[in-house]
Curated annotation (Swiss-Prot):
The active site is at E41 (proton acceptor), H209 (proton acceptor). It comes from the Eukaryota. The gene is eri2. Mg(2+) 1 binds at D39, E41, D214. AMP binds at E41, H209. Residues 266-319 are annotated as: Disordered. Binds 2 magnesium ions per subunit. Its cofactor is Mg(2+). A zinc finger (GRF-type) spans 488-534. Belongs to the ERI2 family. Residues 35-222 form the Exonuclease domain. It is an enzyme of class 3 (hydrolase). This is ERI1 exoribonuclease 2. Zn(2+) binds at C488, C490, C513, C525.
Amino acid sequence: MTTKRLAKELGLLRQRSASSSAQRSSVCKQRFSFLIIIDFESTCWREKSSSGQEIIEFPAVLLSVCSGAVESEFHSYVQPQERPVLSAFCTELTGITQDQVDSAPPLHVVLSRFSRWLRSLQEERGVVFLTDSSGAAPSAQLCAFVTWSDWDLGVCLLYECKRKQLSVPEALKNWIDLRATYKLFYNRKPKGLRGALLDLGIEFTGREHSGLVDARNTALLAQRMMTDGCQLSITSPERRAQVKPRPHTRPSGLRERHTHLTNVKNSRDTHTNTNTHLTNVKNSRDTHTNTHTHLTSVKNTRDTHTHTNTHLTNVKSSRDAHTRLPALMNGSIRARHTHTQQTCANSSDTHIASASVCEVLVSPYTLLSVAHTHTHLQARSAALAGLSDTTYDPESPAPCWQDGELLVEEEEPSSYDDVILGAEPEEATPSEPRRCVSSSVFKTPPPLLRSGPLSPLTHSLGRIAAPLSVHAHTHALKQKVKVTSPLCVCGRRARRLTVGNGGPNHGRVFYCCPRRRSNTHTHTCDFFQWESGVLQNTLSMLTTHTPAAAHTHLR
């Protein structure tokens, strides 16, 4: 029995013939009659660079789907404009020399030539692209663009045209991502273009990372995939790279200079979702930290340096002197941008570890006596005065972030032929250390000056006879005596609040009825009294009564 007869009996010859015809029919059933394969080569560096990449080689290959032959090609080198000198790494990788790009036209000229080449294909072969396929004749040959990944048309060309204010041709806004199609069809992730060809038994021909050679090999891969039964379709119609502009405004938590912090409640569930670093200082009787708090949550603190100028309304707290973080704005926590910013000044006299964005609040019900040295109070007052005059500047040259997360919008990762690109290392030039300015959200308003001196305060507390503000009286009185909230008409202890509406009384402290106005079952007694009035009564009692009687009354 001859070999030919045995093959006929086994049906090998018929099977081959049927398989070949089936493959041709499956290829011809594709939606597109022509495919244009594009594979750009761009400027690249060994290390990462902040500058964008520019196209230096613009190849295109026209593939006939039915015949599987390459019928036309377009190729041109492109002269880079932003960084015209190629790196040694780029020349070694792509094989493109400096002389080739110097004598090449810029990108806008190459795009014009490429558009003329596309028009010639439309006239000669009746090629129709997706942009004008709606009004095309029934006999028109539909054509699509194919790239190995979304990087060529979705990242490289798009970003460069935006930087140079060039318009992308409408036909190049729709393409087929062959790598994504390969992964879905064969259910495996390819290891680059060469690896995808080797997995299918096709040898990569030519020099790798040469634009025209890569386009030809990509055409071979597309033809093989269609032969295996893969139906090519547009993977990213009118897809744009999601370019998110860097916010040039203040973060949401730092937009208003005088922020109204409302409904600050003393509950344990308030700060469970905050991203800020909270330091719990428990059972400490005297806290004298020079770090000015990393947004500190102080529990059971008997003595803490606290400003009374914080913008608060409806502060709800218990008598345990628990400190809560004033980071609730309209009932929601804005902890994303409450980063602690450190003062980077090269000063040997002032040692400030960090400056808090929000000041720590201590329960205002009880003001305990404090025995501090005059030097410590002056140092702390100078530090807080420096913090209150600064504002947040997102364009500052060298911000110093500490104990916070700097959220940066990152571009969706894409590949440039599976090669890590970057910038060449540059020589480090010595420069003077930058001086960072710390920022603060809240600015302490100027103190309200009284019309005349308070001589009783001068004699009793040892102060100089000069016009003093209400805050100065409060601070002086807090160092000597305990001040108890007055009783309202309801018979309850009045609540101590601070005006935060930015008006003429901004920063002043007052007392009101502790009952909520929103409660319909109970009615408030409309009790209201400025703290300055309470202090005046207390000071007058200090001068008219004996020290023992005044001390008994204040308690």
